[in-house]
């Protein structure tokens, strides 16, 4: 199955696949996502998001309603849509190849989850989050999912994402390469990010969030494994 991501920073005709390492794909705008509306979105006739015999699930986050701004908080100027109330931003930038440089994300303070992809190369999706002290791969390109990836990673500082090269700079900051990052910051009573230890029992651990969650995503972080997504729909 194809898992597709669209956003208004990159343009709605440009698709990335979260379950593959393929490059950003630009189709005829009449094929897939054709419009972002005030109360939803419109689809074209492409069989991936709109096959007449299939049922689909989709999740949406509002950033800044499609209005971007230039952000110079980091060493690299980024284009940002940020929703500080919801703790979510979309960041696009062009890498400069300098190890340790930073890029602004538009949310105050430190981020909690950052999902980042090189748009023009078949580099891995890179994921870092609070509570793991690790970088995990959304997809490793071979059908598997890897934990403890250390060839490139992101660090936290107030207002910026640190882009560190430990052997594969193209994943996060290759010279003249284009990137997108989806950045989340925890908002009390609305979102929660962290880790827990399983016990292998049918009476599993209670994971405190402080609210009734509508959407949960989890995966094992000490070994390879699949990401699992649950929602109330």
Q: What label would you give each PLM region?
A:
Residues 1-233:
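Surface-exposed molecular-recognition determinants
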